[in-house]
């Protein structure tokens, strides 16, 4: 797939999500950022996992704070901002939980939480980043 010219299909997004090795939640290994890095890498062939440079909750939140928030951190990783489509990373804000990252799929966002993979309605999306340029 020419990542800069086409966009992921729903089937390829489902495949990338299902290729995630399910394991216990762990910052830097199995958290929301590691999950989106995995899916983005599977869909584009680019290594987004290299941006996961922390191994604890304190380190993760320190990086977020140093960038001025989750949105600014993701702006530094993903190039193309726009209306999220299937396979695109999204920042969501959930009641009680707060902000987290997920992958757009249909009218939902697939996120990894301390309880495993979950699908949230896309109405909670604050911002999305297009992995592929919109033509």
Where do the PLM segments sit?
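N-terminal capping segments
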Residues: 1-65
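Non-catalytic ligand/cofactor/substrate-binding and regulatory segments of enzyme domains
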Residues: 1-19, 115-135
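Generic recognition of cysteine residues
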Residues: 32-33, 90, 111, 132
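General N-terminal targeting signals
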Residues: 42, 107-109, 126-128
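...with weaker cross-activation on analogous glycine-rich loops/strands in unrelated enzymes
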Residues: 56-123
């Amino acid at each position: 797939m020419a990542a800069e010219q086409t966009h992921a299909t729903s089937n390829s997004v489902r495949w990338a999500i299902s290729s995630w090795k399910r394991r216990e939640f762990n910052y830097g290994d199995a958290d929301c950022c590691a999950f989106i890095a995995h899916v983005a890498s599977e869909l584009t062939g680019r290594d987004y996992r290299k941006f996961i440079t922390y191994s604890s909750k304190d380190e993760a939140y320190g990086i977020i704070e140093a960038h001025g928030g989750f949105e600014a951190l993701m702006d530094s990783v993903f190039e193309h901002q726009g209306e999220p489509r299937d396979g695109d990373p999204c920042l969501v804000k959930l009641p009680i939980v707060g902000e987290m990252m997920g992958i757009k799929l249909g009218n939902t966002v697939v996120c990894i939480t301390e309880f495993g993979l979950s699908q949230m309605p896309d109405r909670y999306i604050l911002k999305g980043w297009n992995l592929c340029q919109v033509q």
